[in-house]
């Protein structure tokens, strides 16, 4: 996890707020470092984590986790981490050659119109039996992949609403979801993605949006992060700040716009 980011957001593994839905998004930049931050953050907090890895293998997240000081392998072996490896389980789901829990969760790959009930049941069964672990946490990297697989934005938003009602409201846990906005998306895909992002922004309590610098590439500044906070359940976002950042091998640095040594 990144101590500087914890300081900016006034959070720590010992004092984080339960019941929050955190939305991560990016454009012309890579917000994956935030996924790794929150994965290590909640594992350090002792939470039961259900991680839907739809774009990378378990070994990728494990290697990054090692650099951040957490062992995903140990967390999975002791039951603290439930990891759905989408790249691996999707093959069995499509070919119907595997009936494991992971492939059943991805049954929508065979029939996208069937919806995401199987995926929700996987999340529900993974987190409702948290045992002695801390509050349950759902992390998804990245949700927008489902659009490219033929699932409608409406079906995805229904899925997140069910997850939020179960994880955040009923179980008083947290959710972290990443969505990506690619410049080269087709018109239909872009329309679905815009609908998905608007719906998720309406649902979430905290939004972190990563994008490239307006001035272009800079070796010492990798991008900027816009942060929106919402205080109450039905309130509009009442606080907004922009920070610039640089990602390191074992962390990230954050600073107010214009205060980096690269621009002074």
UniProtKB/Swiss-Prot annotation:
Gene Ontology CC annotations of this record: cytoplasm; elongator holoenzyme complex; nucleus
CDD domains: Elp6
Example GO biological process: positive regulation of cell migration
Keyword Nucleus: yes
Subcellular location: Cytoplasm; Nucleus
Transmembrane intervals: none
Pathway(s) served: tRNA modification; 5-methoxycarbonylmethyl-2-thiouridine-tRNA biosynthesis
InterPro entries in alphabetical order: ELP6 (IPR018627), P-loop_NTPase (IPR027417)
Key words, A-Z: Cytoplasm, Nucleus, tRNA processing
Source taxon at top rank: Eukaryota
Family annotation (PANTHER family): ELONGATOR COMPLEX PROTEIN 6 (PTHR16184:SF6)
Subunit relationships: Component of the elongator complex.
Function as written in the Swiss-Prot or TrEMBL entry: Component of the elongator complex which is required for multiple tRNA modifications, including mcm5U (5-methoxycarbonylmethyl uridine), mcm5s2U (5-methoxycarbonylmethyl-2-thiouridine), and ncm5U (5-carbamoylmethyl uridine). The elongator complex catalyzes formation of carboxymethyluridine in the wobble base at position 34 in tRNAs.
Family affiliation: Belongs to the ELP6 family.
Full protein name: Elongator complex protein 6
Organism, as annotated: Danio rerio (Zebrafish)
Taxonomy of the source species: Eukaryota, Metazoa, Chordata, Craniata, Vertebrata
């Amino acid at each position: 996890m990144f101590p500087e980011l914890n300081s900016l957001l006034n959070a720590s593994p010992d004092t984080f707020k339960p019941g929050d839905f955190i939305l991560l998004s990016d454009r012309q930049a890579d917000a994956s470092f935030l996924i790794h931050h929150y994965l290590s953050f909640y594992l350090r907090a002792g939470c039961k984590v259900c991680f839907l890895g739809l774009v990378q293998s378990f070994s990728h997240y494990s290697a990054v986790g090692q650099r951040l000081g957490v062992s995903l392998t140990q967390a999975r072996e002791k039951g603290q981490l439930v990891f759905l490896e989408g790249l691996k389980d999707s093959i069995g789901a499509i070919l119907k050659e595997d009936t494991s829990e992971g492939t059943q969760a991805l049954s929508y790959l065979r029939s996208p119109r069937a919806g995401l009930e199987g995926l929700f049941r996987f999340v529900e069964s993974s987190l409702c039996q948290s045992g002695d672990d801390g509050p349950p946490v759902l992390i998804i990297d990245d949700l927008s992949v489902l659009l490219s697989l033929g699932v409608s934005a409406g079906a995805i938003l229904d899925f997140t609403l069910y997850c939020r009602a179960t994880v955040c409201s009923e179980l008083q846990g947290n959710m972290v979801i990443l969505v990506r906005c690619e410049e080269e998306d087709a018109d239909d895909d872009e329309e679905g993605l815009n609908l998905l992002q608007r719906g998720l922004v309406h649902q979430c309590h905290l939004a972190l949006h990563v994008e490239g610098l307006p001035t272009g590439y800079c070796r010492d500044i990798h991008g900027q992060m816009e942060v929106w906070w919402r205080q109450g359940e039905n309130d509009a976002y009442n606080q907004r700040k922009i920070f610039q950042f640089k990602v390191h091998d074992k962390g990230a640095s954050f600073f107010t716009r214009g205060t980096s040594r690269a621009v002074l």
